[in-house]
């Protein structure tokens, strides 16, 4: 006996994905087929050229930091005793209380292209009897990111920003040749076909669960490349990052099957890289260390790493010159930049080992051909979190730093700065051993496909508010050193001593549930086909601490929940009356998709208009879930043309709006995209 495979639900949900994201534009019917003796093979190729344009004006009052307002001139600034503007002058201006989230917004003006990309995608499939090999690779070049001019330069030096300066950032978003899938497989019919067995080994994508549009569900096995996903003409098979693993599926009975995987490779989500239009954090992501994390506690502009190295080279030269400089003056100079920026260390990656999962599948024909899934996974976070190391402002630490500088005059680099005790440091980390327990089903109700899933995570790491982390790392250490005792208790993270490494996250249990409805209307209203999809989901955070105990990180929150009896001190730290809400213990939202099809509209051209609407209804999920932000909405309108399964063209418009206060970081980044494709 063989396991019965019910095709309707799977194909309907797959069609829902295609309808929703419109990523699989061209089929593989034109693939080149060939034979090498008993080996059968196919080779597919798709080439794409596309561009995106920003169509909305930047929101200077809500999304741009106060220090980056155009009326300020920061040229010739130095923290060594050259304060250009007072805190009161900066405080009086419109804008955000943080300048750690506005770089990408400043780089692109209304009407600018944000991407000009050409790329190729190739797939090779070989099969011999019951064995096979599959490989997929791609290459791309984004002219805008590699060669484009930008409206915003470094506020101090005037240097033009280069989003491709860092090698990893360049590979992720600027240009690259990469191997995606690369695995071998074998299929066996055990016991005369009663127990079919499939095995795959290599870099591959494993898709579990029933979610279509709402992420962070059961399907967390493979990370996503958000840079490629947001590029013109993106396809899902380009965006899901294959990981090295062994996967197997075994049919136990006619209705019961088991799947399992073991990963020997770990890869993270590639978040939008600083400098790309979709990035909402200036220091997280590849190359973010160049921007530093701006503390903003004084009247200072954004201070990047190159400028800090330049200034410390000057200080080191003064020390090494032998000139007599009072110790008090040297200490003041040693404090100038550590009180204004936090340096960013290299990422701390988890182990490749210890990641595995099991799925038990059951097909119930007596329940309307329903398929059930039961899941368990142990995995390491693919989503970035921020931890840190506190500064040490003790006299001994400062004198030690000055000695190191004097001994290395002429050779000041990033590694040396990171070794200095007086700087606080931020670091992207990926905590290990998250346990996921899941349940899913899919069935049909007439012509409507229904899929649902529940994912319960044990010990999921959730980001503590970054302001609490920064406050614990710097101003609290000024209090510990007796320099500013009035700063004591400024952060909700208490007990942090000089030089301590601080986990920037807490582990809590979370539960996420969602349901998806996909309906195929067929020919209707003059259309050859109409597909509609609706997905609704919610997230519960179990035992989440109250706001007065510990606040978790969400978008647009630039204030501390520390000692409420020090409002004057809070204001002195450039942390004003911003009132955006913090994450909540429950949040939910929904997504709607409609896709119409007009076959052979003219001269053999097929046309497919589509609409995607997203609404985060209530509550805010903490980072790094990146799911729901109360009141946030978006609508995407698209029009796709296809000719003879070879040529394709797509035009889309994306509009972002809504949100409470300034929590919707994309609210002023509407854009249009266009691409053409050719496939053989």
Put a short name on every predicted segment.
Residues 30-43, 55-58, 124-133, 146, ...:
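Short loop/turn motifs that connect adjacent beta-strands in outer-membrane beta-barrel proteins
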Residues 127-286, 589, 618-619, 628-633, ...:
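Outer membrane beta-barrel
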């Amino acid at each position: 006996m063989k396991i019965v495979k019910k095709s309707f639900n799977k194909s309907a949900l797959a069609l829902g994905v295609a309808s929703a994201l419109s990523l699989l534009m061209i089929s593989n019917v034109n693939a080149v087929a060939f034979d090498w003796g008993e080996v059968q093979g196919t080779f597919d190729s798709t080439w794409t050229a596309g561009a995106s344009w920003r169509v909305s004006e930047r929101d200077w009052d809500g999304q741009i930091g106060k220090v980056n307002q155009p009326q300020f001139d920061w040229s010739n600034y130095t923290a060594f005793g050259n304060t250009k503007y007072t805190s009161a002058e900066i405080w009086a201006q419109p804008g955000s209380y943080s300048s750690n989230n506005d770089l990408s917004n400043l780089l692109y003006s209304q009407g600018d292209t944000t991407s000009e990309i050409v790329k190729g995608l190739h797939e090779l499939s070989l099969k011999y009897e019951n064995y096979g090999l599959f490989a997929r690779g791609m290459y791309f070049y984004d002219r805008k990111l590699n060669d484009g001019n930008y409206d915003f330069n470094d506020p101090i030096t005037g240097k033009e920003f280069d989003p491709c300066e860092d090698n990893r950032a360049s590979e992720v978003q600027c240009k690259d040749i990469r191997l995606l899938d690369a695995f071998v497989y074998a299929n066996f019919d055990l016991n005369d076909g009663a127990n079919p067995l499939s095995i795959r080994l290599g870099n591959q994508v494993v898709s579990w669960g029933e979610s279509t549009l709402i992420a962070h569900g059961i399907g967390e096995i493979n990370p996503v490349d958000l840079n490629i996903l947001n590029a013109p003409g993106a396809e899902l098979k380009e965006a899901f990052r294959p990981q090295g693993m062994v996967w197997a599926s075994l049919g136990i009975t006619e209705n019961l099957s088991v799947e399992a995987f073991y990963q020997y490779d770990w890869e993270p989500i590639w978040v939008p890289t600083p400098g790309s239009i979709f990035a909402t954090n200036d220091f997280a992501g590849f190359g973010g260390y160049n921007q530093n994390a701006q503390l903003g506690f004084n009247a200072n502009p954004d201070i990047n790493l190159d400028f800090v190295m330049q200034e410390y080279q000057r200080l080191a030269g003064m020390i090494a010159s032998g000139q007599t400089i009072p110790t008090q003056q040297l200490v003041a100079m040693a404090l100038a930049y550590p009180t204004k920026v936090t340096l960013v260390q290299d990422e701390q990656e988890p182990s490749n080992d210890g990641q595995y999962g099991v799925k038990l599948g059951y097909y119930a024909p007596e329940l309307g051909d329903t398929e059930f899934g039961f899941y368990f996974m142990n995995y390491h976070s693919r989503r970035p979190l921020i931890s840190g190391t506190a500064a040490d402002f003790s006299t001994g630490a400062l004198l030690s730093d000055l000695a190191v500088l004097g001994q290395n005059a002429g050779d000041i680099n990033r590694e040396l700065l990171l070794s200095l005790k007086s700087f606080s440091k931020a670091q992207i980390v990926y905590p290990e051993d998250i346990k996921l327990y899941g349940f899913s089903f899919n069935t049909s109700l007439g012509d409507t496909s229904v899929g649902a899933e529940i994912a319960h995570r044990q010990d999921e790491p959730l980001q503590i508010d970054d302001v609490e982390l920064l406050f614990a790392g710097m101003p609290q250490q000024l209090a510990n050193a007796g320099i500013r005792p009035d700063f004591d208790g400024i952060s909700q993270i208490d007990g942090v001593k000089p030089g301590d490494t601080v986990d920037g996250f807490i582990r809590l249990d979370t539960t996420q549930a969602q349901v998806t409805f996909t309906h195929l209307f067929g020919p209707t209203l003059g259309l050859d086909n109409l597909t509609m999809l609706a997905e609704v989901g919610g997230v519960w955070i179990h035992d989440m601490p109250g706001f007065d105990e510990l606040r978790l990180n969400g978008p647009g929150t630039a204030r501390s929940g520390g000692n409420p009896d020090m409002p004057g001190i809070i204001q002195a730290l450039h942390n004003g009356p911003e009132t955006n809400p913090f994450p909540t213990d429950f949040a939910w939202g929904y997504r709607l998709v409609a896709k119409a099809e007009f076959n052979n509209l003219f001269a053999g051209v097929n046309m497919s208009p589509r609409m995607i609407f997203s609404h985060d209804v209530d509550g805010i999920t903490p980072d790094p879930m990146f799911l729901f932000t109360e009141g946030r909405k978006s609508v995407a309108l698209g029009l796709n043309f296809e000719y003879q399964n070879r040529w394709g063209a797509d035009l889309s418009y994306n509009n972002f709006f809504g949100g409470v206060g300034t929590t919707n970081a994309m609210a002023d980044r509407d854009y249009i995209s266009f691409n053409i494709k050719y496939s053989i």
